[in-house]
């Protein structure tokens, strides 16, 4: 039901999505990948395999992975009930899309991002 | 067609419950606060399940038996958060 399209992504919820730093003015940050666990006005916090990394939005280019149920937790309670060898959501190839976004477009408080580019009704 | 803000609240609700389930209470709180802020700015009503199972005072995701006590009194249910805040909900019958 919940749908994030590549067009709406900069205004949509980033928390819970999988992201990778595709390019950055600081080379040491390129390649950081993980689940977005927190967001501030100027940074995105990724939970990587080796810990938590806080990446400034400015100067970075992020590659977000969109799946049909990106909001579902990777280690949700349902995991234990999946039959052995059954399908996981990662194997359904056509439902996965990668969206590349310039970090500069995300520079906004998390709760204000949804309102960017929308004319206010109260004027 | 739900607005982006409504979809974000929906996702945050799922994320907050998932974080609370894995014991990441402070993360869950932040998700609840962000969802509340979105509802406030976009003049949306939060889902009933969200309103009932989050603490008004400390924004915790309430899990009965773990960080919330649920007791029935005459005519109302009392949900007590670990922080001490009570919430009362009437019932009939």
UniProtKB/Swiss-Prot annotation, chain A:
Catalysed reactions listed for this entry: Endonucleolytic cleavage of RNA, removing 5'-extranucleotides from tRNA precursor
UniProt record, GO biological process: tRNA 5'-leader removal
SUPFAM superfamilies, per the entry: Rof/RNase P subunit-like
Locations listed in the record: Cytoplasm
One term under GO cellular component: cytoplasm
InterPro entries the record matches: RNase_P/MRP_Rpp29_sf, RNP1, Rof/RNase_P-like, Rpp29/RNP1
Region: Disordered, residue numbers: 73-93
Major location (coarse): cytoplasm
GO terms assigned for molecular function: ribonuclease P activity; RNA binding
Family matches, as Gene3D superfamilies: Ribonuclease P/MRP, subunit p29 (2.30.30.210)
Enzyme type, top EC level: hydrolase
Keyword flag Membrane: no
E.C. numbers: 3.1.26.5
Keywords: Cytoplasm, Endonuclease, Hydrolase, Nuclease, tRNA processing
Subunit-structure text: Consists of a catalytic RNA component and at least 4-5 protein subunits.
Family: Belongs to the eukaryotic/archaeal RNase P protein component 1 family.
Protein's job: Part of ribonuclease P, a protein complex that generates mature tRNA molecules by cleaving their 5'-ends.
Entry protein name: Ribonuclease P protein component 1
Species whose genome carries this gene: Halobacterium salinarum (strain ATCC 700922 / JCM 11081 / NRC-1)
Originating gene: rnp1
From Swiss-Prot, chain B:
Cofactor(s) needed by this chain: Zn(2+)
EC number of the protein: 3.1.26.5
Designated name of the protein: Ribonuclease P protein component 4
Keyword terms: Cytoplasm, Endonuclease, Hydrolase, Metal-binding, Nuclease, tRNA processing, Zinc
Record localization: Cytoplasm
Record lineage: Archaea, Methanobacteriati, Methanobacteriota, Stenosarchaea group, Halobacteria
Free-text function comment from the UniProt entry: Part of ribonuclease P, a protein complex that generates mature tRNA molecules by cleaving their 5'-ends.
GO cellular component annotations of the record: cytoplasm; ribonuclease P complex
Gene: rnp4
A GO term, aspect molecular function: zinc ion binding
């Amino acid at each position: 039901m919940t749908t994030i399209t590549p067009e709406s992504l900069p205004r949509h919820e980033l928390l819970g999505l999988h992201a990778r730093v595709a390019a950055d003015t600081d080379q040491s940050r390129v390649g950081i990948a993980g689940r977005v666990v927190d967001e501030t006005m100027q940074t995105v916090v990724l939970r990587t395999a080796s810990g938590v990394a806080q990446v400034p939005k400015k100067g970075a280019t992020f590659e977000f992975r969109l799946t049909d149920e990106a909001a579902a937790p990777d280690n949700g309670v349902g995991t234990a009930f999946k039959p052995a060898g059954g399908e996981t959501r990662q194997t359904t190839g056509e439902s996965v899309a990668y969206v590349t976004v310039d970090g500069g477009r995300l520079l906004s408080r998390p709760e204000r991002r949804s309102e960017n580019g929308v004319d206010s009704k109260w004027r | 067609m739900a607005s982006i803000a409504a979809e974000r609240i929906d996702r945050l609700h799922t994320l907050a419950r998932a974080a609370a389930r894995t014991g990441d209470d402070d993360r869950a709180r932040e998700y609840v606060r962000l969802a509340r802020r979105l509802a406030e700015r976009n003049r949306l009503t939060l889902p009933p399940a969200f309103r009932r199972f989050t603490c008004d005072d400390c924004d915790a995701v309430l899990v009965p038996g773990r960080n919330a006590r649920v007791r029935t009194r005459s005519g109302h249910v009392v949900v007590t958060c670990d922080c001490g805040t009570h919430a009362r909900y009437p019932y009939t019958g």
